[in-house]
Amino acid sequence: CLKTLSVFLAAFAAADARAVFKTQGHKNSEMIPDNYIVVMKDGVSQDDFKAHVSSVASIHSTNKAKRGTNTEGMKREFDIMNWRGYHGHFDRDTLEEILNDSKVDYVEQDQVVRISGLVTQRGAPSWGLGRVSHRQAGSRDYVFDDSAGRGVTIYGVDTGIDINHQDFRGRARWGTNTADRDNADRHGHGTHTASTFAGTAYGIAKNANIVAVKVLSSDGSGSTSGIIAGINYCVQDAQQRGILGKAAMNLSLGGGFSQANNDAVTRAQNAGIFVAVAAGNDNRDARNYSPASAPAVCTVASSTINDSKSSFSNWGPVVDIYAPGSDIIAARPGGGSTTMSGTSMASPHVAGMGAYMIGLGADPRSLCDRLKQLATPAIRNPGSSTTNRLLYNG
């Protein structure tokens, strides 16, 4: 049980173990038993990393044979611009060996991550595009430069995307799947967010390219390790295609605080991918959520058509900007459209705006600050210690 695990790990700390076991999440976090994310220290070479992984695999195999456990061992490796680590299913003896390796920086327990909430209201009007292109509320016209993100790629890290939907006009492609064996968006969340950031009819960056990165299953849930694997894919894909500096990423998802999740999105942002993330939908301080609490990324809260904070939206000093998130209409899998609400809907407005601005020459690394400068100070009751600035395309 988690209580026993906490005592067990406290014993490690008392023994002055070289690596730190990071406590993360909040009281409602859903931990995945015996699953761990291991992060190596900066400067550990590729050769040393491979040697460590091989050693851990051997230790796990020995311990499994000795004790007859059903642990699976090493599951996946990460390398995001030399930020190296892995995810595995290990027994306590193997975990102790990992924590005592001087090359390991920290270990944290894997946890469940979910889409950042949604409410569906069929037939509600669409208003977000008009709002982010006017200083005053009320316009239904979306005014934008016709470049509209041309030459920029947006990675949708979500439940998958219906890449054949008519709203994408052939600009969407499949990337990878770290969630399950079904490369379809059975939920609809990922298709909706992609349509918001780059749909022809419903999107901000109407000419941007779209990549489907499935990290959440049909019930809208996944794991921190799966999210990191998806981010790892995005950075490596952008690097291989030579589009670092011409790419954005949207993560309309979240879980309890995770240093590994925050470190992964920070590496992606620093590599030259503009990262927009949902603040979360619990009407709580976003500092307790990841990746929303990562300082390097653009954390987005949700606003209503009346320029008020959406009742569900998280808030706090880590929020960078507000964007429309209540009653947003966009594409659904199989054709047509539907309406959803959530910070999940606000974040892709910012991801799309990021791609739009990158297409006009903006640097992804400083883009969140630029968006905050352009934003309209319009939000009523934004929340304690929270910005009142609403996304605007300048």
UniProtKB/Swiss-Prot annotation:
Residues 1-17 form the signal peptide. PROSITE patterns: SUBTILASE (PS51892), SUBTILASE_SER (PS00138). GO terms for molecular function: serine-type endopeptidase activity. It is found in: Secreted. Pfam families: Inhibitor_I9, Peptidase_S8. The active site is at residues 158, 189, 344. Residues 18-116 form a propeptide. Its EC number is 3.4.21.-. One of its GO terms (biological process) is proteolysis. Residues 126-394 form the Peptidase S8 domain. GO terms for cellular component: extracellular region. Keywords: Glycoprotein, Hydrolase, Protease, Secreted, Serine protease, Signal, Virulence, Zymogen. This is Subtilisin-like protease 4. It comes from Trichophyton equinum (Horse ringworm fungus). The gene is SUB4.
